[in-house]
């Protein structure tokens, strides 16, 4: 299956994302603590924790930092008194957007999210307004690799689909609870992924042009800058040509 991988669409944002690494680590640690608090400290028995561990390792977090966060969660750290909140809305160009938050204060969080939408030409929607457009999946990504080898190992391990892109990148899709098991099987076969994360995948795409793409990127950046926001998912599709101008 051909197409454009996320590597092409996100490469132009790498420098800005690297500058946010400190904030990213803070958010990952918060998720590790919360997941361990709610489901226990064993990643093999706690899919949410395993997903957080995989994300931490994909972002080059040290095992020591990771293990300390899990221990805090198991020990009942105050940071674990958080709830997961999902907000939905529409962004520039009619993009559908889902925002996953961890918060101990709903009023503060919704005010920050609403402010970002109002600043960037979007609208915060009601529950269910765009959720039906997304499916929760595990995504194991290889920036490059042998398609046949990865596909055979992935499908044998229980993956749902394997997609190869024009630039040589390969994504392995799994049920989100099975992502850790599939990644382990791939590594056992000598196939080390560049990243593994749980994501909300859109069933439809909204094409962004030179006018709407920068507005969408600004909205995503504003949302990601909110301390309570863990993840931002959207169905905006940015071509290589438009991405090169951002």
UniProtKB/Swiss-Prot annotation:
Keywords: Cytoplasm, DNA-binding, Transcription, Transcription regulation. GO terms for molecular function: DNA binding. Gene3D superfamilies: 1.10.10.200, 3.30.70.980. SUPFAM superfamilies: YebC-like. It is found in: Cytoplasm. Residues 1-20 are annotated as: Disordered. Its main location: cytoplasm. GO terms for cellular component: cytosol. InterPro entries: Integrase-like_N, TACO1_YebC-like_2nd/3rd_dom, TACO1_YebC_N, Transcrip_reg_TACO1-like, Transcrip_reg_TACO1-like_dom3, YebC-like. One of its GO terms (biological process) is regulation of DNA-templated transcription. It holds the Pfam family Transcrip_reg. It comes from the Bacteria. Belongs to the TACO1 family. This is Probable transcriptional regulatory protein YebC. The gene is yebC.
């Amino acid at each position: 299956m051909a197409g454009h991988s996320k590597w092409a669409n996100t490469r132009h944002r790498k420098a800005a994302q690297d500058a946010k690494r400190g904030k990213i680590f803070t958010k990952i640690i918060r998720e590790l603590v919360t997941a361990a608090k709610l489901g226990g400290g064993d990643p093999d028995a706690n899919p949410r924790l395993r997903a957080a561990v995989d994300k931490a390792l994909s972002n080059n977090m040290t095992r020591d930092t990771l293990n300390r966060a899990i221990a805090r969660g198991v020990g009942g750290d105050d940071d674990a008194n958080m709830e997961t909140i999902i907000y939905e809305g529409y962004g520039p160009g009619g993009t559908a957007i889902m925002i996953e938050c961890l918060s101990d204060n709903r009023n503060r969080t919704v005010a920050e999210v609403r402010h970002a939408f109002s600043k960037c030409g979007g609208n915060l929607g009601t529950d269910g307004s765009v959720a039906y457009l997304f499916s929760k999946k595990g995504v194991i990504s290889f920036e490059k690799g042998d398609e046949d080898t990865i596909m055979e190992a992935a499908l044998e391990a229980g993956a749902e689909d394997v997609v190869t892109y024009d630039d040589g990148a390969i994504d392995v899709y799994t049920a989100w609870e099975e992502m850790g098991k599939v990644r382990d099987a791939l590594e056992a076969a000598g196939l080390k992924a560049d990243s593994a994360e749980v994501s909300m995948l859109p069933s439809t795409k909204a094409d962004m042009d030179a006018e709407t793409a920068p507005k969408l990127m600004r909205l995503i950046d504003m949302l990601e800058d909110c301390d309570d926001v863990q993840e931002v998912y959207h169905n905006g599709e940015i071509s290589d040509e438009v991405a090169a101008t951002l």
